Regions:
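Short beta-strand segments
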Residues: 87, 139, 219-221, 231, ...
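A conserved beta-strand-loop-helix scaffold within acyl/acetyltransferase catalytic domains
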Residues: 1-30, 36-47, 166-275, 293
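A generic structural signal for short, non-catalytic loop/turn and secondary-structure boundary residues
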Residues: 19, 31, 48, 130-133, ...
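Short, solvent-exposed loop/turn segments at secondary-structure junctions
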Residues: 92-94, 143-145, 235-237
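Conserved beta-strand positions that form and line the central face of beta-propeller blades
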Residues: 54, 163, 219
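Acyltransferase donor/substrate-recognition loop-hinge adjacent to the catalytic core
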Residues: 114-192, 216
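Acyl-donor binding region in acyl/amide transferases
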Residues: 47-128, 133, 243-308
């Protein structure tokens, strides 16, 4: 969701069919000094049975009192709703932005990735939260690919039953169904995974259709059956960096031009996964490496310089 109002609207965001949320703002002397959400994803509770409620959209000045007050408000809202722990930030849940950035502030924000103020991690810990998990973002910019991965790619390309085909934007309903099936299979059992529901995938496809570059988004098929996917997107943040957040009236047209004609040099590798049935087969043991090589080759050939 690129429109924050729509993202937080129960009428427009399919999340609210599976969850509920409340939004908090903090004020001091009539000045806005912070914000935070609290939310419950009932699908997460059904899958993981871990009693976790979430907080998210956490942003404050460097002020421990404000941070404590916001996080305490989120916890107080969650407590009577039969959850035993608070985890976050999730904005709004695990299929969207997750975590607080604690390293890498020298790089500009990447689309659909958390980007926090440098002090926010320390504020959360000072307010009493403890680290749940490290999440790593990898930056790749070297066209000299590892020989072992290239060999895997070469072997996969020789397999007559394997096809790596671009996403077909003219048949997005079909492609959306395929992506949902692969995602729910390939990510099942992973940390904080929750199945993507049809309405959520449809909404995501609507949001992303205008920026998808089919040259760097592809599906792996084995004997005509979807086996894996790699969805890499042009970095929208790079395209709108000088628009000061104003897409209307002319900013949106500028962004689309920069994405489609004068495309960015950076990309976001949003999803890469392989269905379990193919991960278990020795013959396709190199498919994952091959898909990384394929994505890199496609990206560099199109003029992109780096990916996260």
């Amino acid at each position: 969701h690129f429109d924050l109002n729509a993202r937080l609207s129960p009428d427009k965001n399919p999340f609210f069919k599976r969850g509920e949320a409340v939004l908090f703002t903090a004020w001091r002397d009539k000045q806005l000094v912070g914000r935070c959400s609290a939310q419950i994803d009932h699908e997460h509770l059904r899958v993981h049975k871990d009693g976790s409620g979430f907080f998210g959209f956490f942003d404050t000045f460097d002020d421990l009192e404000v941070a404590r007050t916001l996080l305490a408000s989120a916890a107080a809202w969650l407590r009577p709703r039969s959850v035993s722990r608070m985890m976050g930030p999730f904005s709004l849940y695990a299929n969207e932005e997750v975590g607080i950035l604690v390293e890498g502030f020298e790089y500009p924000p990447m689309m659909m990735m958390s980007h926090s103020r440098p002090y926010q991690g320390a504020l959360c810990e000072a307010a009493g939260l403890v680290k749940e998990k490290d999440i790593l973002a990898w930056r790749f910019s070297d066209p000299e690919l590892p020989p072992r991965a290239v060999r895997a790619w070469e072997e996969v390309k020789k397999m007559p039953e394997v096809t790596l085909r671009s996403v077909d934007l003219k048949h997005m309903d079909r492609e959306t169904d395929i992506l949902q099936q692969i995602y729910n299979d390939a990510w099942s059992g992973k940390w904080a995974f929750v199945p993507a529901l049809p309405d959520e995938v449809k909404k995501m496809a609507e949001d992303l259709k205008l920026i998808v570059d089919p040259d760097i988004a592809f599906i792996a098929e084995v004997n005509g059956e979807p086996a894996g996917m790699c969805i890499m997107l042009p970095n929208l943040n790079e395209a709108i960096a000088d628009l000061d957040g104003k897409l209307l009236p002319f900013g949106f047209a500028k962004a689309i031009y920069r994405l489609k004609v004068k495309h960015p040099v950076s990309t976001r590798l949003m999803m890469l996964g392989i269905r379990e049935a193919y991960r278990k087969q020795r013959r396709y043991g190199g498919l994952s490496a091959a898909m990384y090589v394929e994505s890199a080759r496609r990206g560099f050939a199109k003029g992109y310089k780096w990916a996260e």
